[in-house]
């Protein structure tokens, strides 16, 4: 199941989405094993997207979700009111949003959509359960989850894992927990 806001087939071309999906709901190592996943691709292979493409993905989720639904946004943007408005509209339609808190070591309240009060915004901890030096922080972080050396499906292999770092990997742990809670 995939929607590609870039007009492609939804395939992951760098492994980020594969890792995120595997952490949230992978059949072997996922938090919510077996939960239904829809790939909503908003980043090209270069890794840099546009706000309009991200908005297209959020709007697609809003229009096509089946409740209960969780949208994991392992992405971030500088404060963008138009993105915040789209996510708020999606939340009102019944989608729970989990967002990566950011990897800049700064105030998470400067990032969209994680700064929204109804978004579960996730920072990253290390092996000692301490906030990493690079994880964003502040009153807009809802909670922390492991974000260092997180084992996730390896994009280049059907049988091995790769270790990932970042709030992008912490967020799907929380998304998986929310899926278990909501029984998605």
Predicted regions and their residues:
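Subtilisin-like serine protease catalytic core
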Residues: 1, 8-53, 65-70, 91, ...
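Solvent-exposed loop/turn segments at secondary-structure junctions
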Residues: 5-7, 28-30, 43-48, 75-81, ...
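Extracytoplasmic/periplasmic, Sec-exported soluble proteins
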Residues: 11-16, 46-53, 75-82, 101, ...
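Extracytoplasmic/secreted envelope proteins and their assembly/folding machinery
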Residues: 17-25, 51, 55-58, 84-87, ...
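Short acidic, glycine-rich surface-loop motifs adjacent to enzyme active sites
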Residues: 58-82, 100
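Catalytic-core regions built around general acid/base machinery
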Residues: 81-97, 112
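Extracellular S/T/G-rich loop segment that most often corresponds to the catalytic His/Ser-adjacent loop
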Residues: 95, 111-183
